[in-house]
Every structure is written in C-alpha cells, then in structure tokens.
C-alpha cells in the first residue's frame, strides 16, 4: 500500500510539472530571458514604483484601458526596435512581438501595420509636422463623442425610413 501512495505522489509531481511547462505562454520564458539580459530582476528596479502597472490599475473601463495599453505597446515596440540587431535577445523579442500581435491586435496584420506606421512617425520631421497640422481639425472631429453620436442617429434614422418604405 505504501508503494502505491509513493507512485501516485510521483505521478502527481510529473503531471503538475508538465502542466507548468506546457500551459505557460511562450512569452513568459522569453520575458524571463529579457529580464536576465537587462538585469531587470535586481532589487533597484522597484525604486520609484512601476512604469505601467499602476496606470493600468487606475483605469477600469475597457476603452480607457485600450488607450493606455496602446501607449504601452508603442513603448515596447520602440524598445524592441532599439535592440533588433542584438542576436542574444532576437528570439525573445520576436516571440513577444508575435504574442502582442495575437493579444492586442487580434492577429490582424493590417491593424498591427497601421499601429507601427503611427509609432514610426518622427515628430521632428517637418513634412510629418505639416501633414499632422493640416489633418488636425479632422482628427479632432473624429475624437469628439458628439460627432459619433450624430452619425449614429442619422444612420439609424435612414435605416428606419428604409424599413418603413
């Protein structure tokens, strides 16, 4: 009877150990690799609080969180771009970028490409500055919730007319 309990305990250890290996997202191992590379496990990293986590905790509404997340993802893309030629962390960076693509962009390549295009614009480029100022009024109109509500009401009104005719 004693041997049976040892065998069962051993099997449980094997099962739990294998679950830890196979259930873990691939980015976790690569993030740990980056932590080692950047010495991000050192105690002084916690000085002066967190960069992103407190901000994310402050925002509960999905739309607000998406805004904050987009800025954070933009930061990581810029960080990864600075180290794109470092072969020691290349695999880790690519794995994490791919996981961001799945989680944040829902594997939508067009959405990711447009996002990267936006993050790559240089604010010191005079042509970019001129175009941005030229488009400012239209961009501000798109940001306004009133403009979106007006569009929605008009489209509902037209749908209602078509249905009644």
UniProtKB/Swiss-Prot annotation:
InterPro entries to which the protein is assigned, alphabetical: 4_helix_cytokine-like_core, Interferon_gamma
SUPFAM superfamilies: 4-helical cytokines
GO biological process: one example: defense response to virus
Modification Pyrrolidone carboxylic acid, positions: 24
Record-linked Gene3D superfamilies: 1.20.1250.10
GO molecular function, one term: type II interferon receptor binding
UniProt entry keywords in alphabetical sequence: Antiviral defense, Cytokine, Glycoprotein, Growth regulation, Pyrrolidone carboxylic acid, Secreted, Signal
Ribonucleoprotein keyword on record: no
Cellular localisation: Secreted
Signal peptide positions (record): 1-23
Tissue expression remark: Released primarily from activated T lymphocytes.
Residue ranges crossing the lipid bilayer per the database entry: none
Claim: Glycoprotein is one of the keywords in the record: yes
Residues listed as glycosylation sites in the UniProt record: 48, 120
Listed GO CC annotations: extracellular space
Pfam families named in the record: IFN-gamma
Role description: Type II interferon produced by immune cells such as T-cells and NK cells that plays crucial roles in antimicrobial, antiviral, and antitumor responses by activating effector immune cells and enhancing antigen presentation. Primarily signals through the JAK-STAT pathway after interaction with its receptor IFNGR1 to affect gene regulation. Upon IFNG binding, IFNGR1 intracellular domain opens out to allow association of downstream signaling components JAK2, JAK1 and STAT1, leading to STAT1 activation, nuclear translocation and transcription of IFNG-regulated genes.
Sequence similarity: Belongs to the type II (or gamma) interferon family.
Oligomer status and interactors: Homodimer. Interacts with IFNGR1 (via extracellular domain); this interaction promotes IFNGR1 dimerization.
Name of the featured protein: Interferon gamma
């Amino acid at each position: 009877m004693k041997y049976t309990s040892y065998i069962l305990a051993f099997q449980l250890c094997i099962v739990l150990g294998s679950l830890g290996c196979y259930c873990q997202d691939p980015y976790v191992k690569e993030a740990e690799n980056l932590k080692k590379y950047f010495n991000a496990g050192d105690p002084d990293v916690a000085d002066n609080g967190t960069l992103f986590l407190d901000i994310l905790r402050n925002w509960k509404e999905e739309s607000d969180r998406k805004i904050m997340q987009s800025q954070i993802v933009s930061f990581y893309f810029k960080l990864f771009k600075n180290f794109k030629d470092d072969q020691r962390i290349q695999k880790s960076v690519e794995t994490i970028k791919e996981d961001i693509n799945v989680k944040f962009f829902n594997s939508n390549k067009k959405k990711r490409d447009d996002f990267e295009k936006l993050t790559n614009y240089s604010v010191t480029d005079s042509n970019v500055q001129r175009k941005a100022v030229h488009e400012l009024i239209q961009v501000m109109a798109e940001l306004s919730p009133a403009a979106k509500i007006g569009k929605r009401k008009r489209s509902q009104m037209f749908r209602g007319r078509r249905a009644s005719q």
